[in-house]
Amino acid sequence: MTISDKPTPPFAEHEQAFPGKTFDMNIKPDHGEASYKGSGQLAGKKALITGGDSGIGAAVAIAYAREGADVAISYLPDEQKDAEAIAHWIDAAGRTALLIPGDISDPAHASHMIERTVDKLGGLDILVNNAAYQKYFDRFEDITLEEWQKTFDTNVHAVFNLIRLAVPVSYTHLRAHETRGN
């Protein structure tokens, strides 16, 4: 997409039920599919990106692959089609794409994500905690305790848990590379 191809305001209103899907958008976002060229800055690295199927996470996944990283992306199962589209771009960059559907707020799934990434990609160097949940309410008092909990489980607790799980395997992976002189 060139500058002249990009849509200009005013934009048509667009609403989607959670989770939003790129394939269902009226105006498709630019994740750098046609514009970003890498230069090998992440050659040989292994990355896990939560929410890597759309938005900023998708752009990061494509950029990291074009910089030379193998990329695992996590996403909600309803977003499979979006995830497959991003995997296509990772593969096209000559890198390995690993798709891990599930809910990051589930501690068992978080462990599964780290284990699969290490097992299938051979380690973990980079963790991008990109996935988030937010629901709009007109009035503060309309926010239910369940919505509040879901927001914190996804945006705070899951981030903490993934970092807690990733740090030991990342250090192990780093030490193994240092020992081999890589």
Description of each model-found segment:
Residues E115, D119, T154-Y171:
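Amphipathic alpha-helical dimer-interface segment in Rossmann-like NAD(P)H-dependent oxidoreductases
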Residues Y133, E141-F160:
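Catalytic Tyr-X3-Lys loop
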Residues A69-A85:
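Conserved glycine-rich Rossmann-like NAD(P)H-binding loop of the short-chain dehydrogenase/reductase
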Residues T172-T179:
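Conserved small/polar residues in nucleotide/adenosyl-binding loops
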Residues A93-T96, R116-N129, K135-Y136:
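A glycine-rich helix->loop->beta "capping" turn
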Residues G40-I73:
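Canonical Rossmann dinucleotide-binding motif of NAD(H)/NADP(H)-dependent dehydrogenases/reductases
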Residues M1-A43:
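Non-catalytic terminal and boundary segments that flank Rossmann-like NAD(P)-dependent oxidoreductase
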Residues Q80, P101-I114, L145:
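The beta1-alpha1 cofactor-binding region of Rossmann-like NAD(H)/NADP(H)-dependent oxidoreductases
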